[in-house]
């Protein structure tokens, strides 16, 4: 509707509007926008490339945020997501490099693929207990993220979910998680401690590769498989305890762990 209107800096959407369509404001010059309470959905790429947009409030009426909805909104510093949103599309806030914090409401049950990838200024994130899955690349390359609390209902951590989050120093994985995806925490070289609970059965390939800040790791009895290169080049590791039920350890799983004693 207003795609590539680069001179458009502000707009008031009337209360009669119930949905914002796909690509509606793609690559616009918007600095601010007010979304009325009548809107229930924000379409795919609706505000994609609105690089001058600094803040957005998503009202409680909105239930879904589409794929790439705010992709490359590189000036966006503040986002308030309403309490009715149940799904956030893949890469919805990807490359929002100025975004410093965000609170995800209790209505959200899953975080999609690459949802916050490349949000390089993001320092904190609150994930509610309603979230059961974190998709692949969800927080990839969020290098300023120093801490994160994973919710108690979480069952899976996707591939590359936190890779290149080199600002992370510690993380506790809740007892509900059963699988840690490949490259889930790769290149998190600021990570000094990690707790893997007894619920986890598999650790993916490269899951903790290049986490050279880790000094010790305990793999619980619940784990049956450790993927290829899972702890590759964790050169700071001096102690690893492997549970009794591991039946397969992938190739080069501990390669480059030069200080390791088992």
Identify the function of each model-found stretch.
Residues 5-19, 28-41, 51-64, 74-87, ...:
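Structural signature of tandem-repeat unit edges
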């Amino acid at each position: 509707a207003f795609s590539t209107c680069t001179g458009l800096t502000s707009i008031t959407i009337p209360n009669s509007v119930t949905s914002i369509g796909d690509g509606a404001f793609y690559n616009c010059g918007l600095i601010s926008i007010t979304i009325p309470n009548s809107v229930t959905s924000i379409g795919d790429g609706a505000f994609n490339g609105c690089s001058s947009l600094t803040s957005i409030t998503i009202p409680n009426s909105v239930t879904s945020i589409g794929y790439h909805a705010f992709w490359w909104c590189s000036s966006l510093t503040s986002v308030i997501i309403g309490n009715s949103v149940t799904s956030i599309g893949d890469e919805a806030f990807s490359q929002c490099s100025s975004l410093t914090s965000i609170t995800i409401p209790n209505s959200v049950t899953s975080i999609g693929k690459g949802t916050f990838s490349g949000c390089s200024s993001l320092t904190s994130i609150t994930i509610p207990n309603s979230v059961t899955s974190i998709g692949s690349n969800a927080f990839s390359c969020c290098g300023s993220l120093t801490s994160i609390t994973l919710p108690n209902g979480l069952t899976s951590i996707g591939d590359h979910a936190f890779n290149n989050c080199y600002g992370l120093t510690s993380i506790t994985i809740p007892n509900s998680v059963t699988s840690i995806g490949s490259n889930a925490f790769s290149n998190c070289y600021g990570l000094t401690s990690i707790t893997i609970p007894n619920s986890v059965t598999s650790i993916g390939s490269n899951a903790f590769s290049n986490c050279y800040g880790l000094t010790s790791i305990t793999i619980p009895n619940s784990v049956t498989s450790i993927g290829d290169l899972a702890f590759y080049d964790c050169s700071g590791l001096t102690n690893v305890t492997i549970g009794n039920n591991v039946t397969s350890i992938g190739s080069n799983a501990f390669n480059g762990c030069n200080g390791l004693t088992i």
